[in-house]
Amino acid sequence: QEPSFEVGYIAGLMTETNNVGFVGGQKSPTIDQFDYGYRAGVAYAAKELGKEINVDVQYANSFSDAAIGKAIALKMYDSCDIVFHAAGNVGNGVIAAAGEKDKWVIGVDRDQYDLDPDHVLTSAVKRVGKAIQIVTEKVMNGENLGGTTQEFTTADGCVGIAPTSDKNVPADILEKTAAIEEKIISGEIVVPYDEETYNAFIAELNA
């Protein structure tokens, strides 16, 4: 959810319509992390800017049907100028819609800049190689990780925004985002991961 917060923050700072979107695959605790992390990042930016930014959230109920993703996004882009997807192959349809409508899309899991350099604003990425390195080091040090679930965070260097973000995101916004990342690493910002933690985050933000 941490890189989702960062890309949400970027979307919030960069939207010109004050409407941004999120397309999820299927509702699940995993996709909730992307959804609510993104919403929280947008809200944080809106608070900084002293304005309201609406987040249109829709689910495709699929991770494979790119046509559904495209249809949802084409409609979203009537009001939204930036859409983030966490929807597997459905996201390819969202990227296609961004190209057609000449709007921004935010990629997921890997740096998706190569799919459409003119319309992929940034991506919330998992650095799998870094995670493998950490696990390998733990095993080499004699830790028994059998049957355990390993969680990786921004602080581990395993998640973050894509290295190509500087292609389309202005330098001053990247600097602000780097400062946000430091606050996440230090624990000053605790990124929500579901509806309950999101509502608590918003209540504290507006306190």
Please report, for each region that a protein language model flagged, where it lies by residue:
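A residue-level marker of the well-folded mature domains of exported/periplasmic proteins
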Residues: 1-207
